Each structure stands twice: as structure tokens, then as C-alpha cells.
Amino acid sequence: MTSTDGILAGKYPAKAHARRVVEYLRQNGFQGDGVLYLEAQKTRMIEDNDSEQPFRQRRFFFYLSGCLLPDAHLTYHISTDKLTLFIPPLDPESVIWSGLPLSPAQAKELYDVDEVLYTTDVNPTLAHLASKVGFVFAIDGQISDDVSLKSFPDTDKVALKTAIEECRAVKDAYEVAMIRKANDVTSQAHVAVLKAAKSATNERELEAAFIGTCIAQGCREMAYHPIVASGTSSATLHYVNNDEPLIDSSTNKKKLNLLLDAAGEYKAYCADVTRTFPLSGKFSPESREIYDIVLEMQTESLAMLKEGVLWEDVHITAHRVAIKGLLKLGILRGSEEELLEKRVSVAFFPHGLGHYLGMDTHDTGGHANYADKDKMFQYLRVRGKLPAGSVITVEPGVYFCRFIIEPYLKDSELSKYIDADVLEKYWEVGGVRIEDNIHITKEGHENLTTAPKTADQVELMINGS
């Protein structure tokens, strides 16, 4: 048994999370006793159909329960430190179709809670708690019509959501183990795609190889819709068609590269991994040049990562590496400082360096500022210093997207910084992105992603070595 498996053999630390949330509320002015109230996602039916929609648990509820059941509820009484889970009672009509549901006794063994009751006990329990305490925290829009909080003198429907969002930014050992597990499975799936690349003829075959491996290894859900982008489609950041042939019809040869941004989700926790590789098994000279720049962008960014580092500084470092590399190739002209000041590198690296990762792919607590007038930082999803315990993606890229770059070429001020003749050789490269998931520690960082990454490793894997 690995250390990850050993950690995950225990219960999800729901009560510790409840205590952390209360501590945050107290640090932000709440005093006295109170109750936290949360609801799971409801079972919903597909419109005009008798089948259920795919289920995705509410993350706020899961953080304080570890429970993936639909239609459940929870209460946490602050002064008694009592966490109660409410699960749906047995419905005889559904047993013939779905089997027996989890019993309260089974749920008590499975989850880190003090008591398990049926959902028919929600309102009586809330009324009893209201007779003892005056304050209940809930989330606006996540309170069922048949649930009454009116007996509480005071109700706050804002602070709890904020508190959980902020607490989620720092992961405990169990959460990191969940993300590591998702990464282990995801890395295996990336390897499966590398091995299938030479014989595949369409993007969808590689998507199938990825998803099939994830399911077989324990990640039944994808963290997000896979991006399987061949050829110049790799210049589109969130390409999702995944249905194009891998052969270029104009040359009858395989397209240069494939960008695979795909990851599994393990029990509500996500990975987020990107690799770019040559479909032929060998990078073209231009592709290899860009790949090496992007890998260096990531390498220098990773070297900076530790508790307290300013994420904006890491992002700027990645841009500096991109500028140096593109200057060396002759794509850019001018001085490094002038190119940085004019934000010319944003034409080739238009997105943020990364984002927090956890129960959501773009996890909470990043404090993005999409209204920032500085286009270098406008799409940076994390602002400020990185705390120990956070998990963040590091995903630099260089893209040759005509829609983004051509306005620079037409701009009388900015066009002088880009050599259009040299650039012409690189349009076919499309885009290169490399993405790993990094756990920030007090001493530095830990890379949770193990998928092959260097150009030589990738080529060897595709060619069966």
C-alpha cells in the first residue's frame, strides 16, 4: 500500500473542515454559538425525459461531509462540535430499480460525522437547534423550499460560502492525497494516449484512450471536458471538438502535434494536466524549438515556487523566458525590457500561468481580477502570495493563433516587434502547453504530476521505447 492509499483508507476529514470554517468566521467577526446548514445537490431529471441528469455533488456540501449522495443535508452545531448528516430514507418504489440505499448505520461508518438521520428529521432538528442558538449560516440559493430556517432569530446566507471558498485554498494531507491519486490516474491516461498516437487516425480515438484508462484506473468522472487538439487547433486554448482527422488532407501526412489537456476526477478532487507531443513520433525543428521554450518557462517558474512567493512574479518570469526564447528564434525584435513593457509576449502567451486546483479545476480562493486593465494580468486566476498547502497548476504555453497575433501585426506601434517573415515558419506549430499540478510546501514544492514531459521522453514513449 502506498502512502497515498494509506491516507485515503481513512475518512475524509469533514469535521476538521467544519472547524476550519468556523475559525475563519470567528477571525472575520462572528462570535457566539451558531449552526452551519448545507444541502447536497438534488436529483434532477433530464428535460422531457424520465432519466436523471449526470450527478455532480455540490462542493460546499462535500467539503463539510465527504458525502457524494444526492438529496442529503447537514448541520454543524458550533458549540457542541456536532456534525449531523441527513440522508434520504428508503423508498420502496426505487429499490427494485436501484437496490437498497445506504443505511444510517452504514453512513455513520463511512463518513466523518457524529450522527446520521433521515432527511425527514431536517426540520425538527433545525427547530430544536434554533431553540438553543440564535444564528444559522446557509448559502443563498441552496436552501430547499420545504426547509425552514425561520425559527432562527438571525440568518446569514453570504458568509458561509465565502468562508468555505477561502478555506478550500489550503489543502490538508487528505485532500492532497486525493489530488495526487487523480494525478496518478491522469498520468497513466496520458501515457496511454502517447502509446496510441502513432496508430490513431482521429482525435476521438485518443480521447477514448484517455477516458477509458481513467475509468479503468478508478476515475469515473473527468475533471473537465478533454481537450484533444491536433495541428493548428492546438492554438485554441479550450478546443473541445475532438473529432478531427490526424492526417492533414493537404499533405496526406500526419499533422505536426497534438495538445492533450485532460484529467480525471477522483471522488470530487481534480487533476489538470497538459502535454503536447508530435504525432509522427518526432518533433519538427520548429515544434522542438517552441517546446523547449515552453519547458524552460515551466522549469524556471517551478524553481521559484515556495510558501509566500508572489504569483504575479512567477507569471512575469514565465513571460521573460518566452521573450528570450522568441527573440533568439527571431520571431520577436527589440529588447527584453521593451517587449515586456509593451506586453508583446501576451500575443503568444495570452492566458494566466495557472490556477488553484482542488474540488474544482479552477478552484476557489484565487482572487482573480478580470477587470485589470493590464492585459498581462487580466486572465491571471490567482493573485498574491501562495500559502503552504495550496495546490496550483503551472501551465505556460506559446501559441500561434492568427486571431490573437494578427491585430499585433496590423498595429503600427506593435508590429515592429514581430518579424512576420520568421513567424511564417511557426504557424503550423499551433500551440504548445505543458501543465503540471504543484503542491506548495513550507520548504518549497512537490510536483504531483508524473506524466512524461521532456521532449526526449515523449518521443521515446510514442515510439514504443
Swiss-Prot record:
Official protein name in the record: Probable Xaa-Pro aminopeptidase pepP
The UniProt similarity line reads: Belongs to the peptidase M24B family.
A GO biological process held by the record:
proteolysis
What's the catalysed reaction? Release of any N-terminal amino acid, including proline, that is linked to proline, even from a dipeptide or tripeptide
Molecular function terms from GO? manganese ion binding; metalloaminopeptidase activity
Q: How is the cofactor bound?
A: Binds 2 manganese ions per subunit.
Q: Sorted alphabetically, which InterPro entries does this protein's record hold?
A: Aminopep_P_N, Creatin/AminoP/Spt16_N, Creatinase/aminopeptidase-like, Pept_M24, X-Pro_dipept-like
**Highest rank taxon of the organism:** Eukaryota
- Known EC number: 3.4.11.9
Originating species? Talaromyces marneffei (strain ATCC 18224 / CBS 334.59 / QM 7333) (Penicillium marneffei)
Taken from the record, one Pfam family name reads Peptidase_M24
Q: Can you tell me which residues the record assigns to a coiled coil?
A: none
Residues that bind Mn(2+) 2, according to the entry?
A: D261, D272, E435
Which CDD domains does this UniProt record tie to the protein? Prolidase (cd01087)
Top-level EC class as recorded in UniProt: hydrolase
Protein purpose: Catalyzes the removal of a penultimate prolyl residue from the N-termini of peptides.
